[in-house]
Amino acid sequence: MDVSSQIDELDYAGGGLKQETNWWGAFVIGLAGTILVTGIAPVMVTSLGAAAIPVTFIITCTGWLLCLFLAELSAMMPERTGGSPSYAYPAYKERWPRGAEHVNGFTAWAYWLGWFPVAPLNMILASFYLVDRFHLSTAGFTPIHTPIAWWTLGISIFGILLLFIPAYLGIRFGTLFATALALLSMIPMTFLAIAWIFQPSKAHAGQVFHFHQIDGSGLFSSAFGHGWLTIYIAFAFLLTWNVIAMEAAACYIGECKDPARDAKIALNLEGGYGVFIYTMIPVAFVLVLGVKALGNPALVDPKTIFVRFAGKVFSTGGNVLNWLIAVMLIVALVLSALNAIMGCARSLHQMSVDGQFPRFFQHTNKHGVPDRAMLFNVAFSLALVFTGGAVEIYSLSNVGYTISFVPVLVGYFLLRKYRPNVNRPFRLPEWMKYVALALAALFFVIWIYGGLVYTSLPNSSLGGANTRVYYFIGWGILLSYLPLYWYRKRIEDPKYAEEAPPAAIPSPGS
């Protein structure tokens, strides 16, 4: 028999969650990543003009590639839960068992740092629109650096606590809730992305194809005091926190009834739709509003730019349009916040099952979901609300997010190279393992170099100050993984070993 043709069994621990959904559940909750277009598209086009379009397209395509790699990994490890970070550990543990534990712990904790802040960020943004629409008081206080209104604080806290309910009630209920939110937000969002097609007189192709920056200079001109390549890498740091987040669908493959089938459908669909929406929304803004108009700093606010865009396309305006856009954005933000509570909680749960995180996170409720891990996310989300603004949250959160994929992509390469005969219901071409390595290298450069440059840029939301302090706060949170790991290894594991009943001694002759 040809040994090379024998099926190899990959040893790994499953998350033990109920398998009660299908590809639609993973896809629709994973739309939380795609919905982040509402925040990043205005920032990109008002910062870089039409030059934002190719940069956004290229980085978003890396997100689709990531989805393809995760589709293969999730189908070959169908019991793992928590998405991307959960697939790193099995790739390393046989060759480097000691190091693999830290790869697993670091990757899951970095992913958590990348995703959980989406809940407070989105609820803060949603509260802004509610305060504006209902003309609520903007009186407030300044807890750290950015002022926050009392109404914003109250709405954000109430919203986060409210979202814990569908998250707690299980994956089936969460899917129904997410489906309703997705239909209410993504259908109008998709229509807005292509609305100019039905009003061709409102679109001006010349605004797009030269890819001019906001000041009228060319695509390869310097900006913000840096060369073109440096500044695009810097903005890629901001982009990766958003445009590759469509990988969130992978968090729920371990809860699908037929993961071998559902993984490739959910993640391919998520990636393809993500590339479409992340590309077409900036294209639509530039086509209709024009590069010169996008220099208006007021358009950084999503509600303002969407209202201005829709008003120009449909030659209308007024209170009704303001309400429609506000409702669409609020619903989109709520869906994304729901995944921020649910998704990375599963990563912490899986890390705890694997033995690198306190046992507290292993607990599941009667609905088969990691309730304590989700409650942990809620608690930290409530604390992060007090930072007051999106800029601060962006800067500290992406210290974890982008780097979390580097060990996973290297792990993909290792599994394809050293474990080629593991059953893979969905298998990419062999040469894709080198693409995975190249993607890991790109993400690392964006993370380490792009992050340093981006957080050094002056930010108008902070009165011209940079966000470097929040970048280093993110590093501090990232390194806090170590005491939690040591607590599990030095305190909990010895304690449980002492309490475990001794093994039965076989009787003589048995």
What are the residue ranges of the model-derived segments?
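Hydrophobic, membrane-embedded alpha-helices of multi-pass small-molecule transporters
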Residues: 21-38, 43, 156-159, 217-288, ...
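A generic transmembrane alpha-helix motif of multi-pass inner-membrane proteins
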Residues: 51, 177, 185, 192-199, ...
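Hydrophobic alpha-helical segments and their helix-loop junctions in multi-pass secondary transporters
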Residues: 128, 183-217, 284-289, 410-422, ...
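TM-loop-TM module centered on a large, flexible mid-protein loop between adjacent transmembrane helices
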Residues: 85-94, 100, 132-137, 213-223, ...
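Helix-loop-helix connectors at the membrane interface of multi-pass transporters/channels
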Residues: 86-99, 123-152, 188, 251-260, ...
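Membrane-interface "cap" regions at the ends of multi-pass membrane proteins
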Residues: 1-53, 63-71, 99, 481, ...
